[in-house]
Structures are given as C-alpha cells and as structure tokens.
Amino acid sequence: MIQEKILELTEYGLVTGLAAPEDKRFTINRLLELFQLDELEDEVAAAYEKREPMTQETAEDALEGILTEMLDYAAEQGLMPEDTITYRDLFDTKIMSMLMPRPGEVITKFRGLYNHQSAQAATDYFYKLSCDSNYIRRYRIKKDLKWTADTEFGTLDITINLSKPEKDPKAIAAAKLAKQSGYPKCLLCKENEGYAGRVNHPARQNHRIIPVTINGSDWFFQYSPYVYYNEHCIIFNGQHTPMKIERATFGKLLDFVEQFPHYFVGSNADLPIVGGSILSHDHFQGGHYEFAMAKAPVEKEISFKGFEDVKAGIVKWPMSVIRISAEKKERLIELADRILLAWRGYTDEAAFIFAETDGEPHNTITPIARRRGDLYELDLVLRNNITTEEHPLGVYHPHAKLHHIKKENIGLIEVMGLAVLPARLKKEMADLEQALLDGTSIREDEVLAKHADWVEEFLPKYGFTFGSGLEGEVTPERLHEIVQTEIGLVFKEVLKDAGVYKCTEEGRTAFMRFVDKVNA
C-alpha cells in the first residue's frame, strides 16, 4: 500500500539523518503530493506505529524494496511516461529529493565538522549522506564483482562493473528524439546539483556538492555515484574548462591533500587514449583507499640536480612512474613541473618515444598526490598516446591480444592498479567456465571464440587442456578461481602494454636516459 511505503520512507529519512524529527509531517505531505494523494489515512498511520522501529542497518537493506514498490505504484498510476529503468531512475531520484536537506545545510554541517572535529569527520558525514540519499545506489554497487590478483608488482584490484544500468531501447529511442540541451554542459558541471534530469541526462535532485578552494580557485567536491573504491570522490573545477596537466595542476593536487590528508587525489592525463572519459571538464579523482601502486616500493633511487632535498625514485610498477617526496610542497611543484616540461618535449627514437608527430603532441603525465606523515608525495606516470598501423588504438595502450578482456582507455584508476572491466565479462566468464567443465570447444561460439587463444595458453599451467578429460577433475569453484586469477594476469599485461618504458634492462636503461635529460 502506497501510504504505508510513504511512512516507511519517511522513517528511513529520520533514521538515516537525512531528515530531522521536526521534518516528519512536512516530508509525509511532500510525498503525498508527489503521489497525488490528498490524505494519510488514520488507520494506516496507527497500524504503522505498531511496527518494529527501523535501525540504520535495517534502513539500508529496506530502501531498495521501498523504492521498488513506490515505482511500481507510480507506473500503475501513470506517473511515469514509461515503466523502464531510465524513467524509474528519474522518478526514484525525485522521490528521494523529498527527504534531502538543502545544499546550504549540507555545506554548513560539513564545514562545522571540518573546523571543529576533523577533515575525516566531515568526509565521513558527506559520504554517508551521499549513500543514504541513494545518489550512490548501494544495492547496485553490491552487484559489482570484485576480487584481487597477486602479481610481482603487488596485489591488483579487479572489478567487473555492474552498477551502471544498461540503457533500455525505449530510452535510447526517446533520447534521439529529445531536444538537445546544453544544460548542464556535462555530467560534472555544478549545475547538476538538484537537476531533475531527462531521458538523456541523469536526475540529480539528491546530489550535493561541497565548495572547496584549491590553489586559490573555486572547485567543488562530490562523490562518484559508481564508487569503484572506498569513498571514490571527484573534485571538479567550478568552470567548464578542459583538462590540462600543467604546473598549477601539481599545486592543486597537493593543496587538496593538505586539506584532506586522509585522501589521495590524482588527475587523468590531458590527451586522448591515455586520458579519461571526460576531457572536456577539468577534474580530479580521489578517495580513502590505498592502491597497489601506492604500496609499490621504489626499485631504483634517483636524484635530480638542484633538488637533492627531494627524495626521488623509479617505482617497481608495470607502468613508468617517478615518485618524488618532500616536506615542502613548493619543492615538489618545482620538480614536477621540470619533469613535465622535459617529458612534453622529449623524443627517444630508440625507445619509440616521440614528443609529437605532424604537430600532434603525444607526451603527458598522469599525476597522483598523497600524504605520508609529514611528507608530500607525488607519483608522476609518464604517458604517450602515439598510434601506428600495427597498434591503431595506441602503442602504449592494451594491445589487440588483450582486447577480449580490456580494450578501453587506461585512465587514472587503472594506472593505480584497479581494473574496471566491462559488464559483458560476467556472462562470458560464466559461459566459458561451463564450457570448460563440459569439455566443449569455445572456438565455435560466436561470443566466446575471442577468449580461445587465451584459454589454450593458460590451461596447461593447471595440468589440463581442452577436451583432455582431465577438466572433469576440476571443481567449478576451482575453475572459477583459475579464471579470476588469469583475468588478473591479463590486467597486469594491460598495464605493461601501457608502460612507456618496459620492466626490462633495456627499458630501464631508456628510462634513465630520460632522467639524465631532466638533469641536463
């Protein structure tokens, strides 16, 4: 019954702290209005009072069910144009907006916690709000498949992302017919806060952002709705301005970790292929998580002329990383800028590194900042986006042999050691495992054939081959473990492909030629 669900959602708002006790009547009336109801029946309210009270834990578990029933009712009553995932997402965001505090209240509370308790207390509050508001859809995030893979470079994180809903055909058709709008300009713009959304743009009435001053300019802080790792946040420029890696970038990253020392923050590179999916709006990504790259040790200490006070080294990592650390962030900014400028103009034909071809620049950096006690630390990942006939998607990009698992750009998150793999792999791997258990060939399968060479390459490591009969001795659980391990090893190869200097004697010698160039 919809009135009961209205009371249940109101209680959810009170228990989670989205709404204050004084907001109860107001919230009920707003929800009645949304569902085009004139009253709350006394007997419904009386019966509800006798129920077991909600707790924070039961509230979290209950939200998906409450919203599902509300959406079913809205569909039956014609309150949505179509009963599809796109329109349901637009409408349930509108439902949740009825519980939300105004932006000014959120900012005041965040700043109060920051000033009187700690930066972590402030982010704890804001992250919980972003989850409780259903801006971060916890019940979808739980569907993501996650595991780890041990390698000589450390423990890599692997995830198959299932929390982004598939676009339904009706929504795709409607989006094509919809009037094209330039508002908000992109998914990151501050104008998204409170926006009702449309068929080709997500609703954001339950979205809140926090103003932060970084390096003297106006930026904003929010969480990613897809949370690839703990407290995955986005820090974005108040202006819709393109990504650019420059001296000021290092200052902004270090300023942010000075203000939020429990978070790391990094920037995608500013060139296609080696950059992220949004190059049109300057932004960083951070969070409360330590990636494999952050844990990776320095394999070779180096020094830079005039910066003997700055600790520097090449990181033991499949991509090409210079780590620098110092007590004074100004020294890091100076050195990072020197390395960036040297790399932008650097060509080493013997190592197949070209600063530009036909006037198109190729060299850039993916920078990551963090605090280590009293020290500031920067990891500078050298990137190059040159393409060739043999590698049309990029020489320093996953090569074709690995595309059956990962062909998308290697952005900041992957660089640090977390594979974000496409949703298609969930079914493909399940079908692949079943075919292996049954001893049937996958070369004839239209979808699975792309995995055949890979499978035939790794199976002998585990003592059997296709159709040998020995696969019958392997349990489904063990086979699943094997496939997950091998996907992790593919991701390691993906990172090695993306590294401009390979982890070989020849590669490290070439790396040192660049270090010498910086020192020249």
Regions found by a protein language model. Name each.
Residues M1-I235, Q239-P242, K316-P318, L332-A336, ...:
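Active-site microenvironments that recognize anionic phosphate/pyrophosphate groups
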